[in-house]
Amino acid sequence: MPKTQFQVDQNAVKKALHAAARTYDNVGMVPKAIADRLLERLDFIRLNPLCVVDVGARTGYATQQLEERYREAIVVGLDFSVAILKAASSKMMVGEYTALPFADRSVDLIFSNLAFQWSSDLQQTLQECHRVLKPGGLLLFSTVGPDTLKELHSSFADGHRHVHPFYDMHDIGDMLTQLRFTDPVMDTERLIVHYSSVPQLIKDLKQLGAQNASQDRLKGLMGKTQWRQMLTNYENCREENGALPATVEVIYGHAFGTESNSFKNANGEEVTVPIDKIIRRN
């Protein structure tokens, strides 16, 4: 188990994503840039997948890129927000990250961009990824780390959690090891996004559906005095160019399913599985 465990209000996550369905693509430059970085990593991995699942597909940007990259594969985007999936044009499914609707050892590649931080149980989500991956299949993902929005977090300084909690890279790596993924690799980078004002930052987060959904978040409206104090504190971060920085700590990870030959037929050949056979029936 990870040293730190966060309780995520899944209903709050779904509500925020539902509200962001119409605005997500308008402000999704950072998620798209990170998706592009993650997709580039596939250039260095030899993989000819028959089945690809994009977990946390949102409006389908990465799903479309995966379809173009792997034209012979079945590519499915999955998310738990019905509303946000309606904005997508690719093949999409509604499903929970903690109970992936796919059969055991049926998926060659699980791709996930900036989604795992919204899982109600990250360890269970990774366990589900391990379950559905074919032996030797690839899990490739990005998420965000605890330094994300550190300027906003420190500007409140009132003892309450105003920023969604994020797992440390090492905790995620430990989970992958404990779940017996093969050759897990983790790395991180920090991106700085600049804003003219804090209200603009808050607006962008809301339009992305990226709001604090921790169970121990302070519920109810914030007082005017508290809000003004936070704005004053954040002003201390303003840079010489006049911009306010917002840090995004991006965590990248990949690992492989446990090796075995059980997914090949008697002739040692890969078997193509129809999509209706891949989906798990309860």
Swiss-Prot record:
Superkingdom, natural source: Bacteria
Function as written in the Swiss-Prot or TrEMBL entry: Converts the free carboxyl group of a malonyl-thioester to its methyl ester by transfer of a methyl group from S-adenosyl-L-methionine (SAM). It allows to synthesize pimeloyl-ACP via the fatty acid synthetic pathway.
Identification of the protein by name: Malonyl-[acyl-carrier protein] O-methyltransferase 1
NCBIfam families in UniProt: BioC
EC number: 2.1.1.197
Similarity comment text for this entry: Belongs to the methyltransferase superfamily.
GO biological process terms held by the UniProt record: biotin biosynthetic process; methylation
Pathway in which the depicted protein is active: Cofactor biosynthesis; biotin biosynthesis
Reaction(s) catalysed (UniProt annotation): malonyl-[ACP] + S-adenosyl-L-methionine = malonyl-[ACP] methyl ester + S-adenosyl-L-homocysteine
Stretches of the chain forming a coiled coil according to its record: none
